[in-house]
A protein has these predicted regions:
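Contiguous segments within soluble domain cores/interaction surfaces
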Residues: 1-99
Length: 99
């Protein structure tokens, strides 16, 4: 992802999370949680989770360092689940700041 942009992240799931009680998408960099999205900021379909980040949120990531992403959910039957960790990089931009 590029810093200073407003990317939409779509995560495909093999479990229908449309009836989950809680869903969190956590973004971690350098050992610290930088960002966490939760309902209602996440659009949920039977097969996808969709979340859009703001310019401010993507600017909070350090350049060219790994960003770990993980989804956790609490299903309506009380079962807690977690995805594998996804890794991406925050790419640089030439003009810093929000536009």
């Amino acid at each position: 992802m590029r810093r200073g942009t407003t990317p939409t992240h779509e995560f495909t799931t093999d479990i229908d999370l449309s009836t989950a009680d809680k869903i969190y998408i956590t973004y971690k960099q350098g050992g610290a949680v930088k960002l966490e999205k939760a309902l209602p900021d996440i659009t949920v379909t039977p097969t996808k989770l969709i979340v859009t980040l703001t310019q401010e949120e993507t600017l909070s990531f350090s350049i060219n360092k790994g960003v770990e992403i993980q989804i956790r959910a609490l299903l309506n039957n009380g079962e807690a689940i977690a995805s594998n960790v996804i890794t991406t990089t925050a790419q640089k931009i030439l003009k810093e700041g929000v536009i």
